[in-house]
């Protein structure tokens, strides 16, 4: 079975109970199944809270955080430091051999500046699978932050969805976007099992897919196009469904390019 990349929504970092349910499910799953799993995370909520405390402006353009040179150290510390180690600590507390990484470790993802007007924001491309394959073969659980380093040593903040997509391409892995929603819902509140770009556009125009879900759907569609395979959107609230998700069952909404 191909490896699985689990991209965690940042809101999970604000929910200790959700983190516990996730890692309890992962531990139980690893007792019976050996599918290699890598966790990728951002942490936008955590960064926003930090910026407010430091009285620094939060500026976003098309969903990307503008990251000036005087803020990249703070943001890197929040994502590759606090967010990454919080997840790693919870995983270790549940008996998992977790190892905290960034996109730069082992050259797993190649990162370069996206746009000078955005500052230290990076675009991600697949890199070398060697380190991750060695860690997975040794039964480690890599937990990867969305901070990367360019070839000339520049720290870069990468959109977590794009980071997860690049890592999935690096490993030839499936991608699961795990968030606080169980999937995409129709106008009657029922879960939509399968979604295409055409169907998504229609539901957006009808006002059924709105706000933050539009961002999630577009990110999943872009990932599916890039990877050439379906991408799943599902929720972490129902722990009993997580093992099925880890085994590739479409418990949430399966996105087809």
From Swiss-Prot:
Q: Which residues bind substrate?
A: 43-44, 65, 157
The entry's localization annotation reads:
Cytoplasm
Q: What is its EC number?
A: 2.7.2.8
* GO CC term (a single one): cytoplasm
Query: Reaction catalysed by this chain?
Result: N-acetyl-L-glutamate + ATP = N-acetyl-L-glutamyl 5-phosphate + ADP
Q: Where is this site: Transition state stabilizer?
A: 7, 216
What interactions and quaternary structure are annotated? Homodimer.
Residues recorded as binding ATP, renumbered to this chain, are 180-185, 208-210
Q: Which GO terms describe its biological process?
A: arginine biosynthetic process via ornithine; L-arginine biosynthetic process
Q: Name one GO molecular function term.
A: acetylglutamate kinase activity
Q: Kindly provide the name given to this protein in its UniProt entry.
A: Acetylglutamate kinase
Tell me what organism the protein belongs to.
Edwardsiella ictaluri (strain 93-146)
Taxonomic lineage of this organism? Bacteria, Pseudomonadati, Pseudomonadota, Gammaproteobacteria, Enterobacterales
Which keywords annotate this record? Amino-acid biosynthesis, Arginine biosynthesis, ATP-binding, Cytoplasm, Kinase, Nucleotide-binding, Transferase
Q: What role does it play? A: Catalyzes the ATP-dependent phosphorylation of N-acetyl-L-glutamate.
Keyword Cytoplasm in the entry? The reply is yes
Task: Give the top-rank taxon of the lineage listed in the UniProt record for this protein.
Answer: Bacteria
Gene responsible for this protein:
argB
């Amino acid at each position: 079975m191909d490896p699985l990349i689990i991209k965690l929504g940042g809101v999970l970092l604000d929910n200790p109970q959700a983190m516990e349910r996730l890692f309890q499910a992962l531990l139980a799953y690893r007792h019976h199944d050996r599918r290699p799993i890598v966790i990728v995370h951002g942490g936008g909520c955590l960064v926003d809270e930090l910026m407010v405390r430091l009285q620094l402006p939060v500026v976003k353009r098309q969903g990307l955080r503008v990251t000036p040179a005087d803020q990249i150290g703070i943001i890197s510390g929040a994502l590759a430091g606090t967010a990454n180690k919080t997840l790693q600590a919870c995983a270790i507390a549940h008996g998992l051999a977790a190892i905290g990484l960034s996109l730069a470790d082992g050259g797993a993802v190649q990162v370069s500046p996206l746009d000078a007007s955005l500052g230290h924001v990076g675009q991600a491309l697949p890199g070398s699978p060697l380190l991750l394959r060695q860690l997975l073969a040794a039964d480690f659980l890599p937990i990867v932050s969305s901070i990367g380093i360019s070839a000339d040593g520049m720290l870069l903040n990468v959109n977590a969805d794009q980071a997860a997509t690049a890592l999935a391409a690096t490993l030839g892995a499936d991608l699961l976007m795990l968030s606080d929603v169980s999937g995409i819902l129709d106008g009657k509140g029922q879960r939509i099992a399968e979604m295409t770009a055409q169907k998504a556009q229609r539901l957006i125009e009808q006002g059924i897919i709105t706000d933050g879900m539009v961002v999630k759907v577009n990110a999943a569609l872009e990932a599916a196009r890039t990877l050439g395979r379906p991408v799943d959107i599902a929720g972490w609230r129902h722990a009993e469904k997580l093992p099925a998700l880890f085994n590739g069952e479409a418990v949430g909404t399966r996105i087809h390019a």
